[in-house]
Amino acid sequence: MQRRGAGLGWPRQQQQQPPPLAVGPRAAAMVPSGGVPQGLGGRSACALLLLCYLNVVPSLGRQTSLTTSVIPKAEQSVAYKDFIYFTVFEGNVRNVSEVSVEYLCSQPCVVNLEAVVSSEFRSSIPVYKKRWKNEKHLHTSRTQIVHVKFPSIMVYRDDYFIRHSISVSAVIVRAWITHKYSGRDWNVKWEENLLHAVAKNYTLLQTIPPFERPFKDHQVCLEWNMGYIWNLRANRIPQCPLENDVVALLGFPYASSGENTGIVKKFPRFRNRELEATRRQRMDYPVFTVSLWLYLLHYCKANLCGILYFVDSNEMYGTPSVFLTEEGYLHIQMHLVKGEDLAVKTKFIIPLKEWFRLDISFNGGQIVVTTSIGQDLKSYHNQTISFREDFHYNDTAGYFIIGGSRYVAGIEGFFGPLKYYRLRSLHPAQIFNPLLEKQLAEQIKLYYERCAEVQEIVSVYASAAKHGGERQEACHLHNSYLDLQRRYGRPSMCRAFPWEKELKDKHPSLFQALLEMDLLTVPRNQNESVSEIGGKIFEKAVKRLSSIDGLHQISSIVPFLTDSSCCGYHKASYYLAVFYETGLNVPRDQLQGMLYSLVGGQGSERLSSMNLGYKHYQGIDNYPLDWELSYAYYSNIATKTPLDQHTLQGDQAYVETIRLKDDEILKVQTKEDGDVFMWLKHEATRGNAAAQQRLAQMLFWGQQGVAKNPEAAIEWYAKGALETEDPALIYDYAIVLFKGQGVKKNRRLALELMKKAASKGLHQAVNGLGWYYHKFKKNYAKAAKYWLKAEEMGNPDASYNLGVLHLDGIFPGVPGRNQTLAGEYFHKAAQGGHMEGTLWCSLYYITGNLETFPRDPEKAVVWAKHVAEKNGYLGHVIRKGLNAYLEGSWHEALLYYVLAAETGIEVSQTNLAHICEERPDLARRYLGVNCVWRYYNFSVFQIDAPSFAYLKMGDLYYYGHQNQSQDLELSVQMYAQAALDGDSQGFFNLALLIEEGTIIPHHILDFLEIDSTLHSNNISILQELYERCWSHSNEESFSPCSLAWLYLHLRLLWGAILHSALIYFLGTFLLSILIAWTVQYFQSVSASDPPPRPSQASPDTATSTASPAVTPAADASDQDQPTVTNNPEPRG
């Protein structure tokens, strides 16, 4: 192998343009102010450029570094052949590298030496240049030492002055000789000079990673604060997180109902620069793979149904977009570089009611579509499609949608695991995407197989009932006796079925329900008959549940609910899901609970969808935490809620926040025959406008325990509008006339009434006028005028309507659509409680396509959940539970509050926990969960959790509850949250914990805005807590907080007294005086008493007291003292 020689070449300079990320200010910013050519920057090598250099350059570099001549010098001088080679004394890049250049010129020449480097996004950047002439020493080998100086950012680590040292991939030192006889100018360009080289050579220097380099001695003294800050981070080595191109878009089954809602996912840019550079380079040559599991129930009922598609920042379909057609084919659409769209349809149809995996690989213009059936991935179909067009692909400039959206409906079925390989085109054998939740997936398949049998049985029964009913009507058309029999007699039933005993034994509850069903009530439309029969089975089951001992019958009712669910009546599916998830008088079974929740969600059952949305929002009951998946379920119900509210039919009621612990609110609940309702009716009849309005609202929306009765409500609206001249009643009646809700439309009268109400200053009526001109007259200028006026008056509907004008691009004087301004109006409307405005805001938060609404999936879920929980069907369940509670029907109250609480609405969760506290025997007997703990715990994780729920959980953590152990730390957190919400009991409980010796952590004090530096001991903290407790107490008289505060200060005062030096001195002084006085007193008493005399016996002692003789004075004084001391009576 030749190790040294003249004329060796090097790889041709790369002409590939650098990735666009390095072009511009960012690349220039990494160049130091002096000594470095412009354009050198970055930290890691460009992958493609580095591969080219390492394959070619290093091998030649190793051959020429530190080389010796193979040809003797004498022979070289005789040959007079130009050559050049050099020796680098240090193989690493240093600040000053010494290079020995040996060369020979046969003619006058110029010797050129250059150092070029390659960084992350740049190649062949010169950092050192030197040239010199040789005109005299010809035909002689000469040596010159050159000190090559490299920029500091290539040699040293980051420090206070070198802020961005660069990572260099290759450093090449090259030299060449050119002759001067051609007459070229000395100042000719280096690149042009290089082309005329007669001898050239190069070597490759070894680079040092940035964090292995030494620090540079700048010989500058930093200020102490700057030096201290720098020393804190001087030795920190940043680490890039492990990142790859695989994205798991979905890991848990998603029940797609075939409606205009779906899962929204957004890809971020890669944090790894090399991956990001690769992604950018492939924008016009997409290389990626999609792998997803599907279980289809039906093919698309429209032209196209969404499976997985990309929506760009302009709200247009991008690459890729995969849809399902009516016939069962796949429709795959791509966006071209030239701006057009291109689509292709597969040659095969995908299977129904089978779990299968769909793999789609893109590799430039080639698409490979593969379907595999079952968990063993049995091959089903494979198709390769090739195109000559260039596809445009930018997976970060928009968002992906799984299922439906406002642009297209989704499929009817279930999505399984979905993986996306962003930078790789893989063969199906290379894809790792197993069917997760295998048991659940198998249960879904078994459910629909069983339900196919049930639906066939019901369909045949409905057909037989239809023909039997027709024969009876034809034979007995005018028989009055039979009419009476049909009306008052026992219903006619079908006694014989064309099924075998084996099938009857397999579905006993179904055949029992069909045998007991009235033939004449079966619908004639066979397509609707299965669902309606399921509804009748459900109604009979619910009637049994509503009895006195309804919960006791659940186990026998479950089979009937199962049959009802199979018939497509998915209220039964939700009941079953709740029964299994809570263990409501059935063995608790999480798998079955998930199954029926998903089945109900797929059937678009409102409570089931809310249940799924809540479980994924909180990540509870073995459901994974997934806000995008939660949003898909909540948004489905939220979009239906405004429509449901304007639907007069259906079991709906207004969702009211009524707490069972609030006796005052419970007292005003009424019914049509209740005292409150009768009093309102009496006042309304007398012409009281407020009573008429309230009565109409209660009847129209079904509020305060009154059943929904739109017809009666409209009568009161009309009476109030025409008699009392109340603007609110006039407006309400005008809206009813405009929409024809329960009354014949009368646009003319409605407009007159609307103008009349607006003239009275009602902002709703001003907004109504704008709505009239927008909807009926298409006069957008007048509509905007009224809406702007109503918005100034504080009407949220007007804000929403103005947003619609900007969104549609029809706002007068403003050309084109303005989504940013529309979003601002929608946000203002949402803050005023407008449902549609809230929905638009949640959509903006989940997509992140507007700068004013940065992507925030959690906030999107919260806003969609807020609207969904106003749904009237949920309100109906809550109202039934409340009515049962007021009537003392504990079984029914527990049932309906469990059903409502599992949807995630806070008021029902706290009410259910309250019922379980009132009737713990009922909860223990029928529920398979710790009712009090579960639902108070759920409630404290709500956005608008009440303070008493925090107090309850604090007590449960403090005392421990059933199987839950005591946890003082969590108890402190719960009390602190209650205190932060302004509840005085929270402050009081925290103070009691401190009295017991519990230490409140500093972060809790900071949370309560108690400065730990000002309150450094427990006494000062207690004072602050009791003072806040007193200030937040709403009791006018003495409260426990005020008494506790007073007691604390008395203790402090007494403690201060006992520990005072003055008190000790005074006490000692007084005690000394008392002792001295006592001693002096006893001394004086003892001095006044005479010495005792010996007693003399007298024979007549017994009679001496009765003697009339007067005793001498001395004797009298001697006898007087013992008489006084022994006499218990006062002297006379």
UniProtKB/Swiss-Prot annotation:
One cellular component (GO) term of this entry: membrane
Region Disordered, residue ranges: 1-24, 1087-1132
Record-linked Pfam families: Sel1 (PF08238)
Output compositional bias ranges, type Low complexity. Answer: 1097-1116
Return the Sel1-like repeat spans: 575-609, 611-647, 694-730, 732-767, 768-800, 801-839, 840-877, 952-988
Give the modified residues of type Phosphoserine: S608
Report the glycosylation sites: N201, N382, N527, N937
Q: Which Gene3D superfamilies match?
A: Tetratricopeptide repeat domain
Keyword annotations for this protein? Glycoprotein, Membrane, Phosphoprotein, Repeat, Transmembrane, Transmembrane helix
> What InterPro entries does the record tag this protein with?
ConA-like_dom_sf, Sel-1L3, Sel1-like, TPR-like_helical_dom_sf
Membrane-crossing residues? Answer: 1057-1077
The positions making up the signal sequence are none
Give the compositionally biased regions (Polar residues). 1119-1132
Q: How does it sit in the membrane?
A: Single-pass membrane protein
Location in the cell reads:
Membrane
Q: What is this protein called?
A: Protein sel-1 homolog 3
Q: Which gene encodes it?
A: SEL1L3
